[in-house]
């Protein structure tokens, strides 16, 4: 069974699903849902729509340029059937999926950690810029503490 890709959002299109638009120059466009077809008809650029795969890759929210992703590429040239090669391929699929999952998880975790580091840096810069506010607050707390000590000594 051949699984096609949506021209607009790059999601999977299984057999019996989606629509096909063939232009006058015989260029074929496959769409997974009417939303993608309508955006294509309005000539919306998929890179500027936040939920498409290409825009997520451009914003570094998805893993790209990784060797593990080359296994998914579609080959347009017919190959001679070899039973041994087919068995090796089928037996290696779980291992490939495991490696891919591990790399994607690491990519997401790394992205989150770098975001947290950037937030910490911006918070520290904010504190440095507004240090006078903290000094006023600390001074007020010291005065309150001194007043409590005086009351305790007089009692």
UniProtKB/Swiss-Prot annotation:
Its keywords, alphabetically, are: Ribosome biogenesis
Q: A Pfam family name for this chain?
A: Ribosomal_L24e
Record bears the keyword Transit peptide = no
Q: Name one GO molecular function term.
A: structural constituent of ribosome
Which top-rank group of organisms is this from?
Answer: Eukaryota
Which GO terms of the cellular component aspect does the record hold? nucleolus
Entry's Gene Ontology BP terms? ribosomal large subunit biogenesis
Task: Name the family.
Answer: Belongs to the eukaryotic ribosomal protein eL24 family.
Protein name as it appears in the record: Probable ribosome biogenesis protein RLP24
Q: What's the source species for this entry? A: Encephalitozoon cuniculi (strain GB-M1)
